[in-house]
């Protein structure tokens, strides 16, 4: 467990009023700020700090969000029949725009193979 502290008394005067993060499991201390002798983010064994007294500092710990990979959803609000009719009669749908892989494209600008793929992916019988 990590504990935030402010050193209130210490044999080493440069530690007075410094702030540290103590990792009791590892027996280490990370310097948050100190007047002298230690740099920000220095990690030292707690024993290196010598004798000291401290007060605990409340810490707000925000969980780290880690996102790997991902998914996206393209929403096309229309009927299957509309796309099938656009394949047969493209002149009737010159402005028909759909979402494909996050981009807006004119349905008529797709190749016939791409059009069939869009129809197959957009309309499924079940999940």
Curated annotation (Swiss-Prot):
Coiled coil: none annotated. The lineage of its organism: Bacteria, Pseudomonadati, Pseudomonadota, Gammaproteobacteria, Enterobacterales. This is Autonomous glycyl radical cofactor. Residues 5-127 form the Glycine radical domain. One of its GO terms (molecular function) is formate C-acetyltransferase activity. One of its GO terms (cellular component) is cytosol. InterPro entries: Auton_GlycylRad_Cofactor (IPR050244), Form_AcTrfase_GR_CS (IPR019777), Gly_radical (IPR001150), Glycyl_radical_cofactor_GrcA (IPR011140). Acts as a radical domain for damaged PFL and possibly other radical proteins. Pfam families: Gly_radical. The modification Glycine radical is found at residue 102. The gene is grcA. Keywords: Organic radical.
């Amino acid at each position: 467990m990590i504990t935030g502290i402010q050193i209130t008394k210490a044999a080493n005067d440069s530690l007075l009023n410094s702030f540290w993060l103590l990792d009791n499991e590892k027996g280490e201390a990370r310097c948050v700020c100190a007047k002298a002798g230690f740099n920000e983010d220095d990690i030292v064994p707690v024993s290196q700090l010598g004798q000291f007294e401290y007060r605990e500092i409340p810490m707000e710990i925000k969980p780290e969000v880690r996102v790997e990979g991902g998914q996206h959803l393209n929403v096309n609000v229309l009927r299957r029949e509309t796309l099938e009719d656009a394949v047969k009669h493209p002149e009737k749908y010159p402005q028909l725009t759909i979402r494909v892989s996050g981009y807006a494209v004119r349905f008529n600008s797709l190749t016939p193979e791409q059009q069939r793929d869009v129809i197959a992916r957009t309309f499924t019988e079940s999940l």
